[in-house]
From Swiss-Prot:
The gene is macrod2. It comes from Xenopus laevis (African clawed frog). Keywords: DNA damage, Hydrolase, Nucleus. This is ADP-ribose glycohydrolase MACROD2. Residues 377-389 have a biased composition (Acidic residues). Residues 57-238 form the Macro domain.
Amino acid sequence: MYQSNKKKRLWKEEKERLLNMTRDERRKEYREYVSLDKIPSLMEELKSKASSDDESPEEIQVKNSLCEKVSFYKGDITQLEVDAIVNAANTSLLGGGGVDGCIHRASGPSLLAECRELGGCETGQAKITCGYELPAKYVIHTVGPIARGHITPNHKQDLASCYNSSLTLATENDIRTIAFPCISTGIYGYPNEPAANVALTTVKEFLKKNRDKIDRVIFCVFLEVDFKIYKRKLNEFFPKDGGDDEEGEKGDSDEMKEDTEGKPQSPPMKKIKEKKEDTPAPDSPDEEYSAEEATGNTQDMTAMSLETNEGNDVSSPATDPLKEGEELSEAKITGEKISVEPKTPEPEDAKMTVEEKSQEQEDSENMETSQPKVSGETEDLDGDSEEPSDVQKEIASPSNETCQESDPKDTNDDANEA
């Protein structure tokens, strides 16, 4: 009992002594440290890059001041000389593996003694202690969710709460600079990239509402996989031309929502997708026509052939608009599609017979006052658009041959005479 009270008195006295020291005095208490001025902000990195590229740093106009409040560091978090570092702890707060064990070893036994008095911590919450032998003045302990590779909405909510609780606790204790490790990505099994999305999203939203309360947030990574992820995503979440207007914040919110789900898509890619137009597909060589268009085309070509033959001798070959040796003979109509079969050219006598029969039929129809007699041997080959009679409609139904040119019997007789 006496020993316990002595340890309690010791860590309390040590805490009071260290917190009352100035920075220069505290630097005598630890050997290695990385000061804040050695960790540039995103804004300072942009200016440094502009100088190396022979560009004027004054030309860089940053609308989103959050660039000045965010930094990226790869190394040991226990060496950062900031107001507070965040510890990815377990619920007992008594130390463990990973970054938790490193912080406890570097801070000395007084940290463990104070953590015993805190009574543990729930998932998503945070508690604060002194940094003791660390360059950091405070240690904020937070407990991340145990995902084991499978993320649920509760895991996302708990992880976001870790960052929110830590930042809130920092503002309550007048902490202006804070460094975060990658929470829950170790043995707790939270996937690295989705964890980075949650971290960046939550920190950005907090800084928007409390930009005057925090001077610098440092994302400290140790593994190469986390280094590559944060290196790529920091410029997406904290762009130099992000803007503070409502439209820009709305766009950031949509982007962050997608990134939090582990399926990031940058705004430039969205714009490219929106600008893509559907290009028309090239015409197929086997283009299909409707039955009406095919029938009209067949009649027009046949009429053209007949008009050409009117000024020529009967024995002279007719000019065929189709390829030599082919002629539309009949069309098989099936529904709305039609397939055309080639046929060898018929003798000129047969074509003349068709013309004479068509002329006789037309004269006969003009002279009759009653309903005209329709014969299967004749067909309107001039492509006229007159309304057919009921009898003609019945004959021109799909069950009959719509492109019939002449009676096969008469055609064979005329061919023999020739």
